[in-house]
Amino acid sequence: MSVRLRFAPSPTGNVHIGNIRAAIFNWLYARHCGGTFLLRVEDTDLERSTPEAIRTLKEVMAWLGLNYDEPEMYQTSQKDRHLAAAGKLVAAGAAYRHAKGGEGGGEAILFRLPWDAEQCPGVAVAGPCEIEIHAGTEVVVDKTGINFAMPSAKGTPMPVQKCLAGFQNLTVLDAEGTVLFSLNDVIAEVLAGKRREVIAGAVKFRFTRRTITYHDLVKGDLTKPLDSLSDFVIVRSDGSPVFHLGNVVDDVTQQITHIVRGDDHVENTYRHIFMFHALGAAVPLYAHLPMIVNAQGKPYSKRDGDAYVGDFRTKGFLPHTLLNYLALLGWSPGDDREKMTRDELVAAFSLERVKSSAAQMDIRKLTDLNGQYIAELPPAEFVKIAHGWAVAQPWGAGLDAAEFAKVCGVMQIRTKTFADIAGWGFFFTDLPAYDEKTCAKQFKDKPIQDALVMLGEEFATIPADVFTAATIEAVIHGITAACGIQQGKLNQPLRVAVTGTTVGAGIYETIELLGKGRTLPRLEHAARFF
């Protein structure tokens, strides 16, 4: 059977890198296996899942090249199917209606973890179990489960409600060991909602513990005792389906074979396995991805820096850079490659090589990778993209195409993101902006001041047609020696004098690009800061 995977986000506006990484992993695995990749929009939150939010999601996926193979499914369009499934579960005894806590007096529908849980894949008997409960709290047993209290460290009651299925062969005992209640004796009536028991004076539960285990393709075997689970709402009292119902029914409808999602869904999976079984459907394979964290090991968020795909797009990251980086954030191809083409990623990808530990976001590493990809762009493509960014700048109107191409030729290998182009203004304006503190620091020594004045005088004598990097370098070396300045020590003050910045391309190439006509007035202007 061909693999079928889905990306099922709840679009609420900006697309977090954690969500889009899940999409990337689903897409890569589907393409690696020659399977099907689907987009399912879980748009049941009508206030937040606006048309604009959905449009943003689809634009982000298109920008990253995450194409899907069938028309997208909108969860709201499946409501009738969801409610029909809930009705079948109720009819089969796998769910029940309950009015307690219902809004406006309506009935909610809860999924019941099955009393005959061993029929469900992954459920096993762990053995006899005994737990102490809070002696001063009554035990209530009804169709919704078992309500009791556990004692806190200070001895105070901590109320809990757990599913009936978690307490096979339950007996409730008092302090003398007398059996006050046996669940097996009344289980049929309790499940049918015809019996409710209230037991006072209980101090201990004895029961047969059962567990549910599933194999996670990333985390390995994961196990949970049934007595830690509760029945859960699948249809609210207002008639709207809950996430659990819609998610599982849609997976059945779309014949999903592999569910790849964040590890915040690990706990949901135990519940969903029971639902697949109750619906008579095969249980998909699961892979839960590690969380993306900051340097402190906490969930990566906007407080830590750029966290949304749109942030990186507007700051001039290439789409493949982000795809490449996020694919390797929590996954390894099995070697030391950090730059991989789309085809290489598809060929190498496997869920078995996804790491189970949290993945740390490193903006500097991502930025450096983007710089490498920018450096490899064909020059004409770089000029085209860079021009689009340049014309949006205050200095970008009326750029000379030939002059701009020359600047691109020098700056391409030094560009980390296309947002860096905002700092190219000094190439195209008469005078750059000068920072007084920077000038004061760079121009404070008298030999530097003298050298800058002498450079202006010497540059003035050079014919424009030989105002080249080689000629400029020779002049600078000569004046550096004449002023008793150590070789290289003049370059930074000179850069500030002619560009207003402390970073950029080689100073000789920069001055050649500026030309004699822009360089001389800048040296003269810089002298005002001496």
At which residue positions do the language-model features occur?
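N-terminal Rossmann-like or analogous alpha/beta NTP/dinucleotide-binding catalytic cores
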Residues: 1-101, 105-108, 139-141, 145-171, ...
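Alpha-helix capping and helix-loop boundary segments enriched in small/acidic/polar residues
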Residues: 14-17, 48, 260-263, 309, ...
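Residue-level signal for inorganic ion chemistry
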Residues: 16, 26, 57, 89, ...
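Short, acidic loop-beta-alpha module within alpha/beta folds
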Residues: 20-24, 320, 488
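Catalytic adenosine-cofactor/nucleotide-binding cores of aminoacyl-tRNA synthetases and other
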Residues: 267, 279-434, 499-530
